[in-house]
């Protein structure tokens, strides 16, 4: 009986030791730990592009253009957010590309490791964005499967390619 008790206590100790307070799967909805500024650190696309035409293609579009450098999200402790969406705007009739920006505001909620941010476009359409938290909440990742991102054809004319995009934001 004494051996069974010791074995049970050992199993219990191991099971408690296997849990860690920094597990990304923990239910960490602490608003204070989420609130803050997150800067875009990666804009990864399904296919590599050479948008800046330097001879080196990259799947991280931040290596191809400085147009994304100001993209950031501010999550506030009152469950509101502001998203500065710096991007590349392409005139599809001319193939000319320019840096552009748009700022949206809305509300956010958190469930486990997912932050859901919702805002309304000027035309009244509601948009929902889902960000997965990792790295102890310091990293947010958003994956989109069917979206557009900038590319160039063989003549160097800019166009919108359809594919997957994964953006990564890092808390400052």
Located regions from the model:
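Lipid interaction determinants
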Residues: 20-107, 111-172
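Short, linear, compositionally biased motifs with a strong N-terminal bias
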Residues: 11-13
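C-terminal motif of bacterial Sec signal peptides marking the signal peptidase cleavage site
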Residues: 15-18
């Amino acid at each position: 009986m004494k051996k069974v008790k010791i074995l049970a206590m050992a199993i219990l100790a191991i099971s408690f030791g296997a849990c860690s307070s920094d597990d990304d799967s923990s239910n960490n909805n602490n608003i204070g730990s989420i609130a803050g500024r997150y800067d875009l650190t990666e804009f990864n696309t399904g296919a590599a592009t050479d948008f800046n035409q330097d001879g080196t293609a990259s799947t991280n579009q931040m290596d191809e253009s400085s147009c994304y450098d100001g993209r950031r999200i501010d999550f506030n402790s009152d469950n509101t957010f502001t998203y500065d969406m710096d991007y590349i705007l392409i005139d599809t009739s001319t193939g000319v590309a320019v840096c552009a920006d748009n700022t949206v505001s809305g509300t956010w909620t958190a469930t486990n490791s997912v932050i859901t941010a919702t805002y309304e476009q000027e035309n009244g359409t509601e948009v929902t964005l889902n960000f997965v938290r990792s790295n102890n909440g310091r990293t947010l990742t958003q994956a989109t499967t069917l979206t557009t991102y900038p590319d160039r054809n063989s003549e160097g004319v800019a166009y919108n390619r359809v594919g997957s995009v994964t953006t990564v934001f890092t808390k400052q």
